[in-house]
Each structure stands twice: as structure tokens, then as C-alpha cells.
Amino acid sequence: METTIHNLNGDKADTLELPAVFETPYRPDVIERAVVAAQANRKQPYGADPYAGMRTPAESFGSGRGMAHVPRENGQARRVPQAVSGRKAHPPKAEKDQSKSVNTKERKLAFQSAVAATADPSQVEERGHQFENDVELPLVVSDEFEELIKTQEVVDVLESLGVHADIVRSDENKSIRAGRGKTRGRKYRRPKSILFITSDEPSKAARNLAGADVVTAANVSAEDLAPGTQPGRLTVYTESAIKEVADR
């Protein structure tokens, strides 16, 4: 299976025999398991103070007063879960282990299957990405791409490759996040757009594009390739990066 290596003008520069990793069977179940585990392992432990609602000298009056046997302080119920200022019935525990494990072979299969999905136009299109009909996937560009330092230069390359519409889609579909997150520095939600995989340092010229991510071939994960457990992300590889991904 061959693919085209494009230069920065979008023209054909050479051809490349794709590594065997791009022929990995499609396994969305394994991909989902690996991505969910990665998300779970990033969670920060959280829990309630064990003594919350318990710092009170309240005691029950006992029988004979015609009132419930709940601990009271100045006539007001305390400590019990149904009382104002009482403890929580089953609060989250900070010591709870929220991590998830995935077998080594499963994790490797998930990564390889997610890589193979980036070469399937139907999977990429089903995920919502927009690109011209004559675009050949996977998209591979020459290593000169890693030397670009201006965002406008990257935009010009994407336009010549026929995939810039996906950046526009992500920018135009920006929405305000529901919930408290909007007041905590993450006001907007943007759809994921193009993933750039490079060989050396991540390209700073591409990282500011709407919805785009830039990672090295050594650090790319199944979650980068399948955000939200949905494989088939529109991906641009450099020539050196696609060879390094094959060795993962």
C-alpha cells in the first residue's frame, strides 16, 4: 500500500510504502478501552473532609419529648445527613482508586488500530472532518514542514493539501461550555480538527490553529488519534514521523 509524499505546495514529491501498522484491523472496542483508561488515570483524587458535619457537641434528647431522636444543638438538628449542616451520607472518598488498567498488548493494538483508522477516508469523514474529495489519506508531507515558523505558512500548506476547511469547521463551531467550567478558564468548547505528527519538536507554527494538536511520533497516543474514543481523526504526518510511528 503506497501513499503520496507532498511538498509544501501540495504537489507530489515522492511516494512512500506505508508500514504494516496501517493494515491493522479496525477495533473500536479496544480503542475505547484504552482512551477511557487514559482519561481515568489523569483524574485527580477528590473527596470530602472526613470530619465535615461532625464538629458539633450535639446530642439526642432521647425519649419523652415528642420529637425525633436526632442529635440537637440549641434545638436544631445536627450531624445527621438529613439535617442542615449535617454530614454527607456517602461523600466521595479521596482514597478511592479511580485508575483503570489496560493490558500491554491491548494498549498496543488500540494505538495501531487508531493509526490505521487515520488512513480510512470513510472513518475520517464519519467523525465529521471536512476535506476535499481528491485528498489521499493518510496525508504525508515532507520534513520541510517541521521547519515552518509562521502560522500563516501552515495555513497555506493546508489550503494546498485541501484540508483547511476542517480548521474553519472547528473555529465556526466554537460554543460556550455548559456548567461551571466556563468560569474556570475553559469557557469555550471546540471540535477537534487536524492532528499534526512530527518527528522532532512539535511545530509551534501549527499549535494555535482552531482545534488542532501537534505531537511528536514518540509521544502520540491512542487518545490523540481518537479523541472522545472516536477513531478516524484527520491527521497530517511528516515523512520521518510516519516511519517512527511504525516502530511504536
Swiss-Prot record:
Alphabetized Gene3D superfamilies for the sequence: 3.40.1370.10
InterPro entries linked: Ribosomal_uL4 (IPR002136), Ribosomal_uL4_dom_sf (IPR023574), Ribosomal_uL4_euk/arch (IPR045240), Ribosomall_uL4-arc (IPR019970)
Gene Ontology MF annotations: rRNA binding; structural constituent of ribosome
BP GO terms, sorted: translation
Disulphide bonds in the chain: none
GO cellular component: ribonucleoprotein complex; ribosome
Superkingdom of the source species: Archaea
Keyword presence, Zinc: no
Compositionally biased tracts (Basic and acidic residues): 92-105
Keywords carried by this UniProt record: Ribonucleoprotein, Ribosomal protein, RNA-binding, rRNA-binding
Region annotation Disordered: where it falls in the sequence: 45-105
rRNA-binding among keywords: yes
UniProt cross-references to NCBIfam families, sorted A to Z: rpl4p_arch
Function per UniProt: One of the primary rRNA binding proteins, this protein initially binds near the 5'-end of the 23S rRNA. It is important during the early stages of 50S assembly. It makes multiple contacts with different domains of the 23S rRNA in the assembled 50S subunit and ribosome. Forms part of the polypeptide exit tunnel.
Family annotation (HAMAP family): Ribosomal_uL4_A (MF_01328_A)
PANTHER family: 60S RIBOSOMAL PROTEIN L4
Subunit text: Part of the 50S ribosomal subunit.
Family: Belongs to the universal ribosomal protein uL4 family.
Name of the protein in its database record: Large ribosomal subunit protein uL4
Biological source species: Haloquadratum walsbyi (strain DSM 16790 / HBSQ001)
This protein's encoding gene: rpl4
